[in-house]
Structure formats: C-alpha cells, structure tokens
Amino acid sequence: MALSPVAIDLDGALGDTRPLWVDFLVDAERRYASIAPLDPSALPKDRGAAAEELDRWAERGVGDWRGALERFAEDRAPVHFRPSADAATALRALAATGRRLGVYTDAPAELAAVALAHLGAGRRVELVEAGAGARERLLAELGPDTAVAASREDLVRISESGREKP
C-alpha cells in the first residue's frame, strides 16, 4: 500500500518567509516612493491578496515588483533562512519512502522558490503552490489521503511514523 502524500506548510514547517516579506515591503515603500506611494500596513495580511494589490500598484509605473522581490530575497536569504537539521532529516526520510511531497505558502511564488532553494528543500518536493488558495490547490492535487505538516513538529512526526491521520 502506498504511503499518503504530504503537504508541507513552508512557513510553519521549513522556514518562515514572513519577516523577509515585511522587509521587502518596507524597502519597496522607500525605494518606489517617488513613483507610486505604498503603505505596507494597508495591505491585506494574506500575502496572496496583498500580491494582487501589489500587481495593481506596480501598474502605476513601478514595473516588475515580483522580480524585485526575487532579487531582494536572494540577497537576504542567508540572514532570514536557517536550514533546520530536523526538517532536513524529515524531508530526506519522507523522500526516501517515495511519498509525493508538496509545499504550500501564501507568499508569492518568487519568494517561495528562493526560500526552498536556500533551505535545501527544493529538490525534495514535487509540487509547490504559492499565493492565495495555495493550501487548497495543493491538497486538491495530492488527493484526499494527504497528511498535512503545518509545523516542523508535524513534519518530524509524519516522517517518523510513516503515516499520519489526514
């Protein structure tokens, strides 16, 4: 019998991208102030919804904010992301079993990709869903038997048990 797939919360189980997101918004507010004012505190807390607002903001002359986010994240990843030995061991163990592994986050895809690469998790996961509704999209793709690792503790427990209650 095949083991159930695992959906992993990037921010809860692998590395929290929110502080880097906040730093980017503060930088963007300052950097693009003369082009298009930005008030980070007025953005929705859900980063998928915030990204949609930033897309509209960028149309006022800012340009490719997503590319700017990716460059910003690449420059600052070593400060913000510290690979966890527990998480790395758990991912290795899960990947060795042949389970389908997916990661979800409400962060924009550009930030998620940088975080996964820096945390050493990118090559171990099959699917990555980012932005608004990412968790739901990933669970739909992986199927109803998917175990969810919302925290690092969940990830370790699932890897040690070989199975988890959905």
PLM regions and their residue ranges:
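N-terminal helical cap/lid subdomain that shapes the substrate entry/recognition surface
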Residues: 2-85
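Short, acidic loop-to-helix structural element flanking the phosphoryl-transfer center
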Residues: 75-103, 113
